[in-house]
Structure formats: structure tokens, C-alpha cells
Amino acid sequence: MAEAITIARPYAEAVFKLARESGSLFSWSETLDAVNSIVRESQIRELISNPLISSVKLREIIFSVCGKKLNEDGKRLVSLLIDNQRLLVMPQIHELFEQLKAQHESILEAEVVSAFPLDSGQLEKLVSILEAKFQRKVKAEVSVDSELIGGVRIKIGDQVVDSSVHGKLEAMATALKS
């Protein structure tokens, strides 16, 4: 399973990049879903695994089963996967693509802890800086902690940016102890 994910990742990332740049995330999602549904069928899996079936014949079968659900870009992807004997990792490609799509479309949740209450102008500026840095929409949840002395601590996902006076003092204390 881990090997299939490793093999599928570059394909999923390339398709996602193409879909994002062309503004066709939804279309690609449908295309990958259609191909994935076909590849999951036991009879199709047997054909894919059969060394006596030529890549040309396999391509014809997949294209005919998909019908109009497969546009030219989708056909090129299927052809590439067949030529590289990677069509069996389509479920993982589809899964990874959907994960990338979900990440792209979602809004980042930022936990902002400030030493003092932020006015709306300060919060808007902070959010716009975060949106530029992460290139995604950011929703900030703000709280106040006077122990920070000054500055802010921001947590987005597993990343923490601590520009508070308290954080800087702790970093200096740690450096001096080392």
C-alpha cells in the first residue's frame, strides 16, 4: 500500500497542478472518479494484470468503457499510466488528488493569541499577510493572553509563529542555558 501511494504521488500532484492552473479541479475530479470506478472492477483489474493484453487493446477497452466521461487530457493520463504500467495505482492517484483538492479549497484556521486586543484594522492586516504567505484563505480565531507581554503567537496547522516578547525571552533563556 505504501509503495502504491509513493508511485501515485507524482501523478496525483501533476494532475492537481494541471487542474488548478487550468481552473478545472471539478472536471478532473469527475474524470479521475470515472477512471477509478472502472479500474476498481475485478474484470478490468484482471485485464490490466494480464501480460497477454497489449497496451493498445487495454487503452481501447478503457476508452470505450469510459465513453464521454474521458476528455483528451484524461485520455492522455490513462495512456501514460498504461504505458508506464501504473494503471493499477489509479485508486491511490484519485485519493491523493482529492486530498490535494480538499486542502486547496479549504480555509486555513489560524489561532492568533495576542498580548493585547487587536482592532479590526490590525486583524485584517494580519490575516492578509497570512493569506499571502500561505496562498489560501485564512480564518483567524483571536484570543488575548497578557502573559505574552507583547506581540502575537500564531498557530496554523502544525506551524507556530511566535513573535511574542514572552516567546523571545524563552528562546534567549534556552540559548543561554545551552
Swiss-Prot record:
Gene Ontology CC terms: plasma membrane; proton-transporting ATP synthase complex
Membrane topology: Peripheral membrane protein
Family: Belongs to the ATPase delta chain family.
Protein role: F(1)F(0) ATP synthase produces ATP from ADP in the presence of a proton or sodium gradient. F-type ATPases consist of two structural domains, F(1) containing the extramembraneous catalytic core and F(0) containing the membrane proton channel, linked together by a central stalk and a peripheral stalk. During catalysis, ATP synthesis in the catalytic domain of F(1) is coupled via a rotary mechanism of the central stalk subunits to proton translocation.
Gene Ontology MF term list: proton-transporting ATP synthase activity, rotational mechanism
Protein species of origin: Nitrosomonas europaea (strain ATCC 19718 / CIP 103999 / KCTC 2705 / NBRC 14298)
This protein's UniProt keywords: ATP synthesis, Cell inner membrane, Cell membrane, CF(1), Hydrogen ion transport, Ion transport, Membrane, Transport
Name of the molecule in the record: ATP synthase subunit delta
Localization in the cell: Cell inner membrane
Upper taxonomic lineage: Bacteria, Pseudomonadati, Pseudomonadota, Betaproteobacteria, Nitrosomonadales
Record Pfam families: OSCP
